[in-house]
């Protein structure tokens, strides 16, 4: 897992340095891949789409991307602003075991993403972010929610990855 995570981190840095653009890089740490190829599983995917996001159908390549992630495949997605990238990593994170890590350089975007997920959930701990804006007490709350299995999505600022307490966690 560590080697694959470092590959994603390198991809994140490559886009930010060479293309001068900010991108969210999604890394899904999972024990076992899922498959969403049967009709029943496809219906389950659609029902989860409606449950979490209120949509009855995917747009563009979202379903293909999500199925690829659910199968445990590394997936690179390049879509325009408003193309539905966030849903491509949020839905798999919400329906699979474990916590998904999203690297994002923009604190405001992290907050918006977390707020949006929390609006559709009964559990405020379902999504968190770790960045320089948090107090020690808030960081402890985030870590507690992750350790207790309440958090499905964790948005992390790249600079947070260099802190010893984050590395140890």
Model segments located where?
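Helicase-associated low-complexity/disordered flanking segments
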Residues: 8-75
């Amino acid at each position: 897992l560590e080697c694959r995570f470092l590959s994603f981190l390198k991809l994140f840095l490559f886009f930010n340095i060479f293309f001068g653009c900010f991108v969210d890089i999604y890394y899904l740490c999972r024990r076992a891949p899922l498959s969403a190829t049967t009709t029943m599983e496809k219906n389950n995917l659609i029902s989860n789409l409606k449950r979490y996001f209120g949509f009855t159908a995917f747009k563009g390549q979202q379903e293909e991307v999500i199925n690829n992630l659910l199968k445990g495949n590394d997936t690179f997605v390049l879509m325009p602003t408003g193309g539905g990238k966030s849903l491509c990593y949020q839905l798999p994170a919400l329906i699979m075991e474990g916590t998904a890590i999203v690297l994002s350089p923009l604190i405001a975007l992290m907050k918006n993403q977390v707020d949006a997920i929390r609006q559709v959930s009964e559990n405020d701990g379902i999504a968190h972010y770790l960045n320089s804006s948090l107090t020690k007490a808030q960081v402890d709350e985030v870590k507690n929610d992750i350790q207790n299995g309440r958090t499905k999505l964790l948005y992390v600022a790249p600079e947070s990855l260099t802190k010893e307490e984050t590395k140890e966690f």
